[in-house]
Swiss-Prot record:
Disulfide bonds: none annotated. Keywords: Ribonucleoprotein, Ribosomal protein. HAMAP family: Ribosomal_uS2_B. It comes from Microcystis aeruginosa (strain NIES-843 / IAM M-2473). GO terms for biological process: translation. Belongs to the universal ribosomal protein uS2 family. InterPro entries: Ribosomal_uS2, Ribosomal_uS2_bac/mit/plastid, Ribosomal_uS2_CS, Ribosomal_uS2_flav_dom_sf. The keyword Transmembrane helix does not apply. This is Small ribosomal subunit protein uS2. One of its GO terms (cellular component) is cytosolic small ribosomal subunit. The keyword Metal-binding does not apply. It comes from the Bacteria. Gene3D superfamilies: Glucose-6-phosphate isomerase like protein, domain 1, Helix hairpin bin. The gene is rpsB. GO terms for molecular function: structural constituent of ribosome.
């Protein structure tokens, strides 16, 4: 049984790229056609590459590798957090702080500060501090939790990263390249496939597209760590009832068109 069907990809709008004038020519191999000035991603290739990514991720998870999900754009932030937590991974979904990986020792010091402040809060010790001091410390705690909360259990550098919106997360990509950390990334039509190790051509703006693909990657991690599809199914009910996302258009109308091979070119 395939990891994902063409119908699922179509219904989630995975095939919609950017306007043709905003493309990266290096993505031409993954582009099927153009419609009304918008590039359409070749979903046959996307489906195959998701299969390959799934097998790769499952194998790495089975070997005990640790994953970091990165995506700070509004559409992806909640999904990044949800799927990272579901698969027992780390995440950054608010802002990428320069040196988060390449200057890990310094960042780890800030993470320890976060844990220290959390302990003060949870133990009730902050309530015993002067009101002004407690207010300052709580503001510091809130800021650290916002930016570092997703990596507070990360004891060392991740073995692999999963990225949504390569262009927005370019600084993170550069840090991973410097450190030799493999990159799994959704690639919209304005991205550069040469910058990643495991490409997944896909719409990285639509919530349903991001949710579908990150969900599959998360499934692969769970299956790899816990040994089989049953482990994934154990989590599906909670996952389906989690965060609600705004509804997007119904893309199933494109299914017949895609299957027929008709295009504007």
């Amino acid at each position: 049984m395939p990891v994902v069907s063409l119908a699922e990809l179509l219904e989630s709008g995975v095939h919609f790229g950017h306007q043709t004038r905003r493309w990266n020519p290096k993505m031409s191999q993954y582009i099927y056609t153009a419609r009304n000035g918008v590039h359409i991603i070749d979903l046959v290739q996307t489906a195959q590459l998701i299969e390959e990514a799934y097998e790769f991720v499952r194998g790495e998870a089975d070997r005990g590798k640790r994953f970091l999900f990165i995506g700070t754009k509004r559409q992806a932030a909640a999904i990044i957090k949800q799927e990272a937590l579901r698969s027992g991974s780390h995440f950054v979904n608010q802002r990428w702080l320069g040196g988060m990986l390449t200057n890990w020792e310094t960042i780890r010091g800030r993470v320890e500060r976060l844990k220290e402040l959390e302990e003060l809060e949870n133990s009730g010790a902050l309530d015993k501090r002067p009101k002004k001091e407690a207010s300052v410390l709580r503001r510091e705690l809130g800021k650290l939790e916002k930016y570092l909360g997703g990596i507070k259990t990360m004891r060392r550098l991740p073995d692999l990263v999963v990225v949504v919106d390569q262009r927005r997360e370019y600084n993170a990509i550069q840090e991973c390249q410097k450190l030799g950390i493999p990159i799994i990334s959704l690639l919209d039509t304005n991205c550069d496939p040469d910058l990643v190790d495991v490409p997944i051509p896909a719409n990285d703006d639509a919530i349903r597209s991001v949710k579908l693909i990150l969900g599959k990657i998360s499934d692969a991690i769970i299956e790899g760590r816990r040994g089989g599809q049953a482990a994934v199914e154990e989590y599906e009910e909670d996952y389906d009832n989690e965060t609600e996302y705004e509804e997007e258009g119904d893309y199933s109308q494109y299914a017949a068109e895609f299957a027929s091979g008709d295009d504007d070119n």
